Amino acid sequence: MATTMRLDKYLKVSRLIKRRTVAKEVAEKGRIAVNGVTAKPGTNVKSGDELVIRFGPKIVTAKIERLEENAKKEQATEMYTIIKEERTDESR
């Protein structure tokens, strides 16, 4: 098990975002924060980090539980815990 991983790869492997290219685009637009700091696609993440991801009007806050280089669909949801999901009126 890795101790750190690139943000874009983690989002893809954990299936929080289905494609790494999409994860990269979302991060480049400043729509992902790691521990309260806006993150770039290459930002290293580790277990215990908190992610806030903005998808249009939806905001998802998740805690990283563990890192895996590869994960089957059933295992992917064990890589994180959803802390909060909310909708905003904003749809940028």
Swiss-Prot record:
Xref: InterPro entries: RqcP (IPR025490), S4_RNA-bd (IPR002942), S4_RNA-bd_sf (IPR036986)
GO molecular function, one term: rRNA binding
Keyword flag Cytoplasm: no
Signal sequence coordinates: none
Keywords: Protein biosynthesis, RNA-binding, rRNA-binding, tRNA-binding
Superkingdom assignment: Bacteria
BP GO terms, sorted: translation
S4 RNA-binding domain span: 5-65
Quaternary structure (record): Associates with stalled 50S ribosomal subunits. Binds to RqcH, 23S rRNA and the P-site tRNA. Does not require RqcH for association with 50S subunits.
Function recorded in the entry: Key component of the ribosome quality control system (RQC), a ribosome-associated complex that mediates the extraction of incompletely synthesized nascent chains from stalled ribosomes and their subsequent degradation. RqcH recruits Ala-charged tRNA, and with RqcP directs the elongation of stalled nascent chains on 50S ribosomal subunits, leading to non-templated C-terminal alanine extensions (Ala tail). The Ala tail promotes nascent chain degradation. RqcP is associated with the translocation-like movement of the peptidyl-tRNA from the A-site into the P-site.
Family, similarity comment: Belongs to the RqcP family.
Alphabetical list of HAMAP family matching this protein: RqcP
Protein name: RQC P-site tRNA stabilizing factor
Species assigned in the record: Listeria monocytogenes serovar 1/2a (strain ATCC BAA-679 / EGD-e)
